[in-house]
Swiss-Prot record:
Belongs to the influenza viruses nucleoprotein family. It comes from Influenza A virus (strain A/Equine/Jillin/1/1989 H3N8). Pfam families: Flu_NP. The gene is NP. This is Nucleoprotein. GO terms for cellular component: helical viral capsid; host cell; host cell nucleus; ribonucleoprotein complex; viral nucleocapsid. A motif (Bipartite nuclear localization signal) lies at residues 198-216. One of its GO terms (biological process) is symbiont entry into host cell.
Length: 498
C-alpha cells in the first residue's frame, strides 16, 4: 500500500488510539479484551451460570448481544420515541440456557439496560470502552459471514451472487467505527453506497437541506473508505468520480457495480481480525491471565494460543454434525469465511468442507426450537499451525496491478497459487465502456486481462508451529492446484435477513 504511512494499524483503530508503538498497541488491545473478559465473568455471576453454562457459546452470544443493545444509543432513542407494543425500551435480554436434570432448558431473561451499562463500565475501569463493543460486533459479523449467504441482498442491489467473496462485514452495524470499516469487503461498501444512491433517486429531499448535508458528508466518507480499499490507480480514480458526482444516480450505481466486479480479480485490501466470543476471554481472565500486562494482538499468534487452551461448548440440534459446527465457529473466530479452504485446512490440520456440504445450521437457536432434543458438544477450535492475518487482498505483484484469487478474500498471509478461471469473470465485462469513466474502465479491463493466474500470492510466506511465537521458521505449504478452495462452492446456506 502506497499510503501505508498515513494508515493506523488495525489495533489502533480497534482501540481508538492515536499512533502507538507495538508494545503500547499490544497493551491497549490486551486492555480491551481483558475488559470483555471481566464483564463476562461478572455477567455469569449475576446470572448464576455454572462453569459448563458459562462456556456455552449460545449464552456468550446472548450476553454479548445484551451489552451491544444496551449501548445502541440510536436504537434506544428510537425505541423511546416510537413505543411499540411489548418492547420495553429500557430493558434488554435474550435466551439463557441452563443444564437441569441432564437436559438443557431455555430461560428468557430481561435486564435493565442501565444495569448492563454499569456492569460493562465497571469491568472497563469506568470507561465506555467502545473498542470492546466494536470487537464484539466484529465477532458477530464474522460469525454471520461464515453462517449465512447474502445472495438475496446482492441481487436486490443489482449485484451478482458470484460476488459473495466481497461481502465481508455486510451485517456490521453502521456504528462500528474505523475498526468496522477496516474489515468491510469491497462488496459491502458498494452495497451500502448503492442503497444510499437509490434512496436519493426515490426521495427528492434525501440530499437537500441540513439533513441532506449530513447525508452528503456520510456519502463522501463511505466513498473514501471504499477508495482506500482499492489498490490500483484506475479503480481509485473511478471512486473519485463517484464521490464527486453532483447528484448521484444510475451512472454511479453502474460504476460501483463495475468496480465491485473488477475487485474479483484486482482484490481490495480488507482487514482480518480474530475476534473471539466473550466467554473465551472470560475463561482466560478467570484463570488469572492478565491480558493488559501480557499484551495481545488480533492478527498474530495470541488468538490461536487462546483457543488452544479454551474449552467452549455449543448446543447441537439432533441431526447436526458436531465437527461441522466446530468448523463453522473456527472460521468465524479467525475471520476465515472468505479464505481458501486449502489454506484454512492446512492451518487447522483438518480437512474443511465447503458450506454446501456442512451438516449444521447457525449457532444461534430460535425461540421456537424444541429444547428437549438438544445436546451439547465441545467445539474443536484448536489448530495445528498459526499464521499472520493479512489485509492485502493477495494480489501477486504490488508494482503492477495483478491478480488475486477470484472467489477468495485471503485471511492468512500464506503462499498459495491462484487457480482461477479468468474467462468466466471477464465475460461479465463485455459491452459498456462509454461514459465519463470510459478510460478508467478500459484501463481496469486491460489490467485484468493481463493478470497472470500462474503467479503465487504471498510469495515465501508460510505458517508457523504453535511453539514458534516469534514467527522465525515459516513453513510454506504446497497445495493441490486442481481444486479451487472456495467455501461457498455449491452453496445452500440460509439467507441472512433480520
Amino acid at each position: 500500500m502506497a499510503s501505508q504511512g498515513t494508515k493506523r494499524s488495525y489495533e489502533q483503530m480497534e482501540t481508538g488510539g492515536e499512533r502507538q508503538n507495538a508494545t503500547e498497541i499490544r497493551a491497549s488491545v490486551g486492555r480491551m479484551v481483558g475488559g470483555i473478559g471481566r464483564f463476562y465473568i461478572q455477567m455469569c455471576t449475576e446470572l448464576k451460570l455454572g462453569d459448563h453454562e458459562g462456556r456455552l457459546i449460545q449464552n456468550s452470544i446472548t450476553i454479548e448481544r445484551m451489552v451491544l443493545s444496551a449501548f445502541d444509543e440510536r436504537r434506544n432513542k428510537y425505541l423511546e420515541e416510537h413505543p411499540s407494543a411489548g418492547k420495553d425500551p429500557k430493558k434488554t435480554g435474550g435466551p439463557i440456557y441452563r443444564r437441569r436434570d441432564g437436559k438443557w432448558m431455555r430461560e428468557l431473561i430481561l435486564y435493565d439496560k442501565e444495569e448492563i451499562r454499569r456492569i460493562w463500565r465497571q469491568a472497563n475501569n469506568g470507561e465506555d470502552a467502545t473498542a470492546g463493543l466494536t470487537h464484539l460486533m466484529i465477532w458477530h459479523s464474522n460469525l454471520n459471514d461464515a453462517t449465512y449467504q447474502r445472495t438475496r441482498a446482492l441481487v436486490r442491489t443489482g449485484m451478482d451472487p458470484r460476488m459473495c467473496s466481497l461481502m465481508q462485514g455486510s451485517t456490521l452495524p453502521r456504528r462500528s467505527g474505523a475498526a468496522g470499516a477496516a474489515v468491510k469487503g469491497v462488496g459491502t461498501m458498494v452495497m451500502e453506497l448503492i442503497r444510499m444512491i437509490k434512496r436519493g433517486i426515490n426521495d427528492r429531499n434525501f440530499w437537500r437541506g441540513e439533513n441532506g448535508r449530513r447525508t452528503r458528508i456520510a456519502y463522501e466518507r463511505m466513498c473514501n473508505i471504499l477508495k482506500g480499499k482499492f489498490q490500483t490507480a484506475a479503480q481509485r480514480a473511478m471512486m473519485d468520480q463517484v464521490r464527486e458526482s453532483r447528484n448521484p444516480g444510475n451512472a454511479e450505481i453502474e460504476d460501483l457495480i463495475f468496480l465491485a466486479r473488477s475487485a474479483l480479480i484486482l482484490r481490495g485490501s480488507v482487514a482480518h481480525k480474530s475476534c473471539l466470543p466473550a466467554c473465551v476471554y472470560g475463561l482466560a481472565v478467570a484463570s488469572g491471565y492478565d491480558f493488559e500486562r501480557e499484551g495481545y494482538s488480533l492478527v498474530g499468534i495470541d488468538p490461536f494460543r487462546l483457543l488452544q487452551n479454551s474449552q467452549v461448548f455449543s448446543l447441537i440440534r439432533p441431526n447436526e454434525n458436531p465437527a461441522h459446527k466446530s468448523q463453522l465457529v473456527w472460521m468465524a473466530c479467525h475471520s476465515a469465511a472468505f479464505e481458501d479452504l486449502r489454506v484454512s485446512s492446512f492451518i487447522r490440520g483438518t480437512r474443511m468442507v465447503p458450506r454446501g456440504k456442512l451438516s449444521t445450521r447457525g449457532v444461534q437457536i430460535a425461540s421456537n426450537e424444541n429444547m428437549e432434543t438438544m445436546d451439547s458438544n465441545t467445539l474443536e477450535l484448536r489448530s495445528k499451525y498459526w499464521a499472520i492475518r493479512t489485509r492485502s487482498g493477495g494480489n501477486t505483484n504490488k508494482q503492477r496491478a495483478s491478480a488475486g484469487q477470484i472467489s477468495v478474500q485471503p485471511t492468512f498471509s500464506v503462499q498459495r497459487n491462484l487457480p482461477f478461471e479468468r474467462a468466466t469473470i471477464m465475460a461479465a465485462f463485455t459491452g459498456n465502456t462509454e461514459g465519463r469513466t470510459s478510460d478508467m474502465r478500459t484501463e481496469i479491463i486491460r489490467m485484468m486481462e493481463s493478470a497472470r493466474p500462474e503467479d503465487a500470492s504471498f510469495q515465501g510466506r508460510g505458517v508457523f508451529e504453535l511453539s514458534d511465537e516469534k514467527a522465525t521458521n515459516p513453513i510454506v505449504p504446497s497445495f493441490d492446484m486442481s481444486n479451487e478452495g472456495s467455501y461457498f462452492f455449491g452453496d445452500n446456506a440460509e439467507e441472512y435477513d433480520n
